[in-house]
A protein has these predicted regions:
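Positively charged n-region of N-terminal signal peptides that target proteins for export
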Residues: 1-4
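Surface-exposed, glycine-biased beta-strand/turn segments
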Residues: 19-107, 191-321
């Protein structure tokens, strides 16, 4: 019966994602068999099960976690994790970091998935090893092997007991990040180009898998992403076409005035939709930025990825960056 449950789960995924395979990225069968998240999510050293989930789940809600941490199901005699790590969707390898000391993600791989209606990235971090044959640009099927689970990191050491896969699904802010970062004169070297974590924004992988399992992604990933709760709508006056619109056309509404864009954000900073301004303010000038609407509940969290402050009851942006490319 357990094997049948796992098969039915994959069949639901395949139908929900327009024929694309979607698989669990580790050897664990717990999610596919309907078990509670505590059976497959790895907590931090705090022991709190929710600390391995996505969102404001750490430090009493003040620290954001941009993925889920999946625990191992097998270990060697030394207690090190042995689980294989696999591509969640069919796609291509976009970035490989084999040097653990270069990132708090440790050894990690980023994949892109151009076969989907939204070219999301997936990220697989803290690996003990990456398949030696894996190359940037290589294609992998769903369940294609990436490496082995581990606890590699350049920052705080991860104990054996907390070995896990840090897994993300998300979007890239812009294609010009590498050049922008170089111009900022940061002290830290950017080893990862456009795949630097500053340029990637994940959404909740577990909620996405649950939605796929229940058949709620029949319209593809674009419908799912646009259905995420909106925290803030920011209006940017510009005649340029943002990179996001070029990269994710299914998340854009290009009907409207060519004087700017209304950008719909989730509370954690995911730009879920860009749309041409329908009702521009008279006298608005290029480069002006304003908040069109906001959800008080969504922006009242302790941990917000959006750079906003509150003046009385009205929020305002303290910084705004929009990546654009020459037409």
């Amino acid at each position: 019966m357990r094997r049948l449950c796992a098969y039915v789960l994959l069949a639901l995924f395949a139908g929900a994602c327009r024929g694309a395979d979607l698989v669990w990225p580790t050897d664990s069968k717990a999610f596919g068999e309907g078990e509670d998240y505590t059976s497959f999510i790895q907590p931090t050293a705090s022991g709190r099960p929710e600390s391995g989930l996505f969102g404001d789940t750490r430090n009493n809600g003040y620290r954001f976690h941009e993925g889920i941490d999946i625990k191992p199901v097998s270990r060697d005699k030394r207690g090190e994790a042995l689980d294989g790590i696999y591509a969640a969707f069919p796609g291509k390898v976009a970035m490989i970091n084999r040097i653990a000391g270069n990132s708090s993600y440790g050894r990690y791989v980023v994949m892109e998935h151009p076969g989907l209606d939204v070219n999301v990235y997936t990220l697989y971090a803290h690996l003990s090893e990456i398949d030696p044959s894996l190359k940037v640009g290589a294609s992998l099927p769903a369940k294609g092997r990436i490496g082995r689970m581990g606890r590699s990191s350049s920052s705080i050491p991860i104990a054996k007991a907390q070995s896990h896969l840090h897994f993300e699904i998300g979007l890239m802010y812009g294609s010009n990040f590498k050049a922008w970062y170089a111009a900022q004169k940061y002290k830290e070297k950017n080893f990862f180009g456009n795949y630097n974590g500053m340029n990637l924004q994940g959404f909740d992988p577990l909620e996405f898998y649950r939605a796929a399992r229940s058949g709620k992604i029949g319209e593809g990933l674009s419908g799912y992403i646009k259905s995420l709760p909106t925290a803030l709508v920011v209006r940017v006056y510009t005649r340029n076409i943002p990179d996001f619109v070029r990269n994710y056309p299914t998340l854009a509404d290009v009907n409207g005035e060519d004087c700017g864009w209304d950008i719909h954000f989730t509370w954690y900073g995911l730009p879920k939709k860009f749309e041409r301004i329908k009702n521009p303010r008279v006298g608005a000038k290029g480069g002006e930025v304003e908040i069109v609407s906001y959800n008080p509940e969504e922006i009242s969290r302790k941990c917000r990825r959006l750079i906003i402050v509150r003046d009385g009851q009205a929020p305002r942006l303290t910084n705004c960056l929009l990546y654009t490319s020459p037409s």
